[in-house]
From Swiss-Prot:
Function of the protein: May act as a double-stranded DNA (dsDNA) mimic. Probably regulates the activity of a dsDNA-binding protein.
Protein name per UniProt: Putative double-stranded DNA mimic protein HAPS_1002
Pfam families: DUF440 (PF04269)
Protein family: Belongs to the putative dsDNA mimic protein family.
InterPro entries recorded: dsDNA_mimic_put (IPR007376), Put_dsDNA_mimic_sf (IPR036763)
């Protein structure tokens, strides 16, 4: 089983985000993302949260998944506007993923 590298997980999340954002985000959020991403945008891999079971209804092994956030950072380099949180299987053969979109 080949694991996704952090760069691969980030690239996959960003590709999915670009493909699905228009169907899952409000037009104002899409405009904000497009206007601000070059200056303040971030795509970051974070420690996999253990509360995904509450979000998706399935118990997961945090070590088997990568969590990637896509959003905008503030002047303190903190991501304070998250457009999507991705849970992506580390198994490169299994492209399973879940997304929580900004509501």
């Amino acid at each position: 089983m080949a694991n996704l590298s952090p760069d691969e997980a980030i690239e996959l999340a960003y590709d999915i985000f670009l493909e699905m954002a228009s169907d899952n985000l409000e037009p104002a959020d899409i405009l904000l993302f497009n206007l601000q991403f070059e200056e303040r945008g971030a795509v970051e891999m974070v420690e996999t949260s253990e509360n995904w079971e509450q979000e998706i209804g399935v118990l997961i092994d945090p070590d088997a998944f990568a969590e990637v956030w896509i959003g905008l950072i503030n002047q303190n380099d903190e991501m304070d506007d998250i457009f999507a949180r991705f849970l992506i299987s580390n198994d490169a053969e299994n492209r399973e993923y879940h997304v929580i979109w900004k509501s």
